[in-house]
């Protein structure tokens, strides 16, 4: 039974999304429907957690807007996500960055991962 579910879910997985990690700064472009109109809204911030795997995979992005912390959780393979851009790679040692919730300003920054 498990193999059947995995086979069905594998067909619906998206392959056009980049491979990002915890601590990366990403721009998530989300389709927003308001009445009959549809537009694309961008949400930029730091990835503080990734959860589950397969079709049910989600990730949470955090940013500070007007002095107030805003977190938004997105389903990875949902059709409402138009695209994801990685703006900066982060260097972290934790799988979940919940400690960023308590920090403000420069203390809430994640070190940048330098690639050669």
UniProtKB/Swiss-Prot annotation:
Q: Does the keyword Ribonucleoprotein apply?
A: yes
Q: Name one GO molecular function term.
A: structural constituent of ribosome
* Residues making up the signal peptide according to the UniProt record: none
One Gene Ontology term of the biological-process aspect is: translation
Tree of life domain: Bacteria
Record Gene3D superfamilies: 2.30.30.790
Alphabetical UniProt keywords: Ribonucleoprotein, Ribosomal protein
**Annotated TM spans:** none
Cellular compartments per GO CC: cytosolic large ribosomal subunit
Residue stretches in coiled coil: none
Q: What does this protein do?
A: This protein is located at the 30S-50S ribosomal subunit interface and may play a role in the structure and function of the aminoacyl-tRNA binding site.
Similarity remark: Belongs to the bacterial ribosomal protein bL19 family.
Mind telling me what this protein is named?
Answer: Large ribosomal subunit protein bL19
């Amino acid at each position: 039974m498990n193999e059947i579910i995995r086979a069905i879910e594998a067909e619906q997985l998206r392959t056009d999304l980049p491979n990002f990690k915890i601590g990366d700064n990403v721009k998530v472009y989300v389709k927003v429907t308001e009445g009959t109109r549809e537009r694309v809204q961008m949400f930029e911030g730091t990835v503080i957690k990734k959860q589950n795997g397969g079709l049910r995979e989600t990730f949470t992005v955090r940013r500070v807007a007007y002095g107030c912390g805003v977190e938004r959780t997105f389903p990875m393979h949902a059709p409402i996500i138009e695209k994801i851009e990685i703006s900066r790679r982060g260097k972290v040692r934790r799988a979940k960055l919940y400690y960023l919730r308590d920090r403000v300003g420069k203390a809430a920054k994640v070190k940048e991962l330098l690639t050669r």
